[in-house]
Amino acid sequence: MADIRGVGTPIDYQEDNPITEWVEKLRKSLDAEKREPRDQPEREILGRWLGYRGRDELENTVGLACYACSHFDMDFEWRYLLTDHIRTEAGHGWGYIKQADAIDPTRDHSKPDSDFEYQYGLWPRVEHLAIQRRDLLSYIFAGNLWPYGHVTAASIQGIHITTPRVLQFEEVVVQAEERGHHDALLQKIHDYVWELIERYGEAPTRKRIAEIDAEALNSRPRTIFDPPRRDFLRKYFNVPIENVAKFHEWREYLYSTVLGFPPEPVFIKNWPPEIPQPALVAASV
């Protein structure tokens, strides 16, 4: 592991690495199984799901970034990066809503759909949202900026009932922009963490990050760790969950190449039961 300790030291993270390459191969291997909706009920549930996803992006991912800008003390580089994050994620959210409208024009998918959420148990993840509102460090490591999604999003983006337009939107817009703008934030995250280490000490800072990460990972932060959403997508869209097998390896890679130290072990309560969760291994300094 390269020594990347200290503010301003370039991180060792590489966008193309064996883990993301493995996930991309999994994505591609599922393409042949994808198909368009066969009838109006399938168009309706696909449209309502995509509408739900778009509204969730706008209300929560974008909303929390706006909250962070207005409530947390941060420098202007952070404000610039978060503004770009807001623009990108808002485009994705609105894009999913418009894709939903094209699939099922009988419904305005920009409007709340509480009946859909109630029917399938897609409740707001209030605990996870609350963590992100505490402070900037919690927002970074509990939320969308820390890119666990490079591995976990293969599930939510792996729906088997879809359309060519949705696939093109996800490939050309969502996946490309997600990787690009998240990766641009990683050097800033590294420097912010090492600023905290210089101010408060390494042990307390690492302990605080470990606490935030563990609490967030057990608050249904992502679809694959949220049983209601995961079960809904497995039942109606046959999404993959094999990608979770690479999660702990990806977590180790992120910590070592972005922060310069290993993660503390964590047990995720809502881990998919079909995939064995690796045994906990103590972090080495």
Regions found by a protein language model. Give the residues of each.
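Non-heme di-metal
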Residues: 2-285
